[in-house]
Amino acid sequence: MNKQPSQLAGVYAVTQPRPDLQEAVAAVLRGGVGIVQYRDKSEDADRRREEAGALCRLCEEYGALFLVNDDVDLAAAVAAHGVHLGRDDGAVVAARQQLGDTAWIGVSCYDDLDRARRLVAEGADYVAFGSIFPSPTKPESGLAPMELLRSGREATGCPTVAIGGIDAGNIHEVAAAGADAAAVVSALFAAEDPEAAARQLVAQWQRSR
């Protein structure tokens, strides 16, 4: 899949563990999600590799981007489209050397525009700011001003992703504020019907662009 900035757009699903994760990811893809990030902090490396490989193949079937959270080795092993790095997840330069020029490398920038500039200069392809709203997934996260979504793009020239507490009731706010994509966790993967939740989020996003 050739890397185009326009691919990094819309509703961006970040997984959380659940026993039927493959079925849930298939459901959100049917619902119109175009980006999936696999996030699993467990120590079961074999299960994570098997699960990530299956999800990568599933995303390929739907023409969606598949990224791995934190783990560059896992991203390389399953031929993911890229990796998302947090504060302590290793250097962008090292990830680029391992994954190659065609891989997507995203970075968490919290509320730090200087960090965004620095990591894009090192080779990151997109920057994520948040938590934009209070997050049920990471309640300890500080809040980032919504203005960063637009100023971050202007400062770096790269797509910006909003993350933190985003659901169907507020996704229109981050769309209107200039985010290229909205990362969603609980509103998709804690939903009783992930496909319906995805359709609602995608519709709200599209109405607000």
Curated annotation (Swiss-Prot):
Sample GO molecular function, one term: magnesium ion binding
SUPFAM superfamilies: Thiamin phosphate synthase
Record Pfam families: TMP-TENI
One annotated GO biological process: thiamine diphosphate biosynthetic process
InterPro entries assigned to the protein according to its UniProt record, in alphabetical order: Aldolase_TIM (IPR013785), ThiamineP_synth_sf (IPR036206), ThiamineP_synth_TenI (IPR022998), TMP_synthase (IPR034291)
Pathway note: Cofactor biosynthesis; thiamine diphosphate biosynthesis; thiamine phosphate from 4-amino-2-methyl-5-diphosphomethylpyrimidine and 4-methyl-5-(2-phosphoethyl)-thiazole: step 1/1
Catalysed reaction equations from the record: 2-[(2R,5Z)-2-carboxy-4-methylthiazol-5(2H)-ylidene]ethyl phosphate + 4-amino-2-methyl-5-(diphosphooxymethyl)pyrimidine + 2 H(+) = thiamine phosphate + CO2 + diphosphate; 2-(2-carboxy-4-methylthiazol-5-yl)ethyl phosphate + 4-amino-2-methyl-5-(diphosphooxymethyl)pyrimidine + 2 H(+) = thiamine phosphate + CO2 + diphosphate; 4-methyl-5-(2-phosphooxyethyl)-thiazole + 4-amino-2-methyl-5-(diphosphooxymethyl)pyrimidine + H(+) = thiamine phosphate + diphosphate
EC number: 2.5.1.3
UniProt KW keywords: Magnesium, Metal-binding, Thiamine biosynthesis, Transferase
Listed GO CC annotations: cytoplasm
Binding site for 4-amino-2-methyl-5-(diphosphooxymethyl)pyrimidine: Q37, Y38, R39, D40, K41, N69, S108, K138
Function: Condenses 4-methyl-5-(beta-hydroxyethyl)thiazole monophosphate (THZ-P) and 2-methyl-4-amino-5-hydroxymethyl pyrimidine pyrophosphate (HMP-PP) to form thiamine monophosphate (TMP).
Protein name: Thiamine-phosphate synthase
Native organism taxonomy: Bacteria, Pseudomonadati, Pseudomonadota, Gammaproteobacteria, Chromatiales
Gene symbol of the encoding locus: thiE
